[in-house]
Amino acid sequence: MMAENNLKMLKIQQCVVANKLPRNRPYVCNICFKHFETPSKLARHYLIHTGQKPFECDVCHKTFRQLVHLERHQLTHSLPFKCSICQRHFKNLKTFVKHQQLHNETYQNNVKQVRRLLEAKQEKSMYGVYNTFTTEERWALHPCSKSDPMYSMKRRKNIHACTICGKMFPSQSKLDRHVLIHTGQRPFKCVLCTKSFRQSTHLKIHQLTHSEERPFQCCFCQKGFKIQSKLLKHKQIHTRNKAFRALLLKKRRTESCPMPNKLNANQGGFENGEIGESEENNPLDVHSIYIVPFQCPKCEKCFESEQILNEHSCFPARGGKIPSRFKRSYNYKTIVKKILAKLKRARTKKLDNFQSEKKVFKKSFLRNYDLISGEQSSEQTQRTFVSSLGKHGTYKTTGNRKKKTLTLPFSWQNMGKNLKGILTTENILSIDNSVNKKDLSICGSSGEEFFNNCEVLQCGFSVPRENIRTRHKICPCDKCEKVFPSISKLKRHYLIHTGQRPFGCNICGKSFRQSAHLKRHEQTHNEKSPYASLCQVEFGNFNNLSNHPDNNVNYNASQQCQAPGVQKYEVSESDQMSGVKAESQDFIPGSTGCLPNVLLESEQSNPFCSYSEHQEKNDVFLYRCSVCAKSFRSPSKLERHYLIHAGQKPFECSVCGKTFRQAPHWKRHQLTHFKERPQGKVVCLRFG
């Protein structure tokens, strides 16, 4: 019945094509305006626009738009057509017929090839072979026996062919292993990583990757390998060497010792000594000789070639001689020139205060310290440091005393830990960049003249490396693995990850992560800028004041009007009665956030001024916190500040329950929950 219906449909289509009758399509889709012949086709077309698929498969629950598509899909679950040769299933009759034709073609081609071979071998004249063989296996492998037609027929019976791809195999086990490729099965599974393999040998090789065992060991250099093929490749390195091959082919003397050859400590290469020949082992057997081809005399490491051994050099011990090829690279003057060039580049790029210069010294100079300078005692270091400073210091007369001012770069103040042993124990610069108990003020300059002196460089940096490696980096961050010198800085860093900004401005409501940032921001709301030097030029930022060209401002600790919190330091030389004074180039803001209460002086202005004038300006801060000693202008700000110590946040959001310390923060947060619609209605985002 199905065949008859198909023939009728074909005849109708042929008649329509031959006569080219015009089709009448009165039914139009009101969405895409397509025309259809029948209402059923129009209804089926509407399913495309609605997205409905009414026909569902019972097995896999797939849906289809037409019944024909469902019937075609159901054939994939049943696969009614089965091949009797390779046991494969097909859902379509056409593909099944094509598949059977392939089997017939391969079978016919194989039969034709076998017949041609038999005819060609039978035509050849066979003569008697009188060769004798020691074993039956060698006789079976002889080519004359293979040319026998009776032998070839027996051989052909034992050939196992694959029914899928037609490949031939000598045994059934190999054929079964080959069939796994077509089926996709991997029966051998690893217990540790659940990887599967087709052969057991592959699984055993894979299991070696999980263990640290190296069963295959090189007999020359005792290096272990997990796979035998890698061991064979490694042995080619030994046999490829000319000196190694010469040793193998050379006649051994029985008088020489059987141990490995001696190594000369004065030479860097391998000394080819004579190796004794054992009575049991064959002298030409490579595996019976224990040879280390190229070995370093100091660290006793083995290398595969002489070139690698020449490139390798052990670091010379302290006080030892430097090789001639390293003398040029570790020249003392070239290192100082490189340091100065990098420092100039760092200044032009305007990097941070001292960290850039410190990194330059750390990477370029201290790396080569062991080759340049040996150990020095602390007394020698102090003498060389004071004598070198005497060449580059400047004298200044103040009253009846003649004082000497050191010209130190500002970055050396922060490297106080490296300057231990240079000054006496009373005058050592502390780690927190402050000075202890003596009149030692610091004035800044470019520092190029100071760095040109090699003695100062050698003395200033001839300290143990432990001071640099273990420089108070104790507290690491568990999120980004950054290291900080103190817990307070780590807590301040955690605010970046949490997103908190606890310090808010009362005027504009901006929030900041640090109190110093808030204080700097509050100066933008003031009418007058607080930071002004003696030239009466106002600045909006503290950094702009420090970069001012006329800013020759010094901390003066020798005046009578001593500001609170400033310490006196003095370093006296044995030759003179004058003290050594170091004056700072830049300001260091105090913990209170305002300008330090120190006396400012300039070389061009009057050095005598009263401290009371500066104190009158700061008398505005009347209300002081009893916990942290911070001062405020009004009691309301002091009360708000006390909330930080108490940990209270009185303003709570009614939507999400978050608490805030200030009302502007709470109002600004509430805007995140509400938004305006175009009609002017305000809708809460949480409750819709």
UniProtKB/Swiss-Prot annotation:
PROSITE patterns: ZINC_FINGER_C2H2_1, ZINC_FINGER_C2H2_2. It is found in: Nucleus. Pfam families: zf-C2H2. SUPFAM superfamilies: beta-beta-alpha zinc fingers. GO terms for molecular function: DNA-binding transcription activator activity, RNA polymerase II-specific; RNA polymerase II cis-regulatory region sequence-specific DNA binding; zinc ion binding. The keyword DNA-binding applies. There is a cross-link at residues 11, 112, 121, 146, 262, 420, 437, 681 (Glycyl lysine isopeptide (Lys-Gly) (interchain with G-Cter in SUMO2)). InterPro entries: Znf_C2H2_sf (IPR036236), Znf_C2H2_type (IPR013087). One of its GO terms (cellular component) is nucleus. Keywords: DNA-binding, Isopeptide bond, Metal-binding, Nucleus, Repeat, Transcription, Transcription regulation, Ubl conjugation, Zinc, Zinc-finger. May be involved in transcriptional regulation. Belongs to the krueppel C2H2-type zinc-finger protein family. This is Zinc finger protein 770. The lineage of its organism: Eukaryota, Metazoa, Chordata, Craniata, Vertebrata.
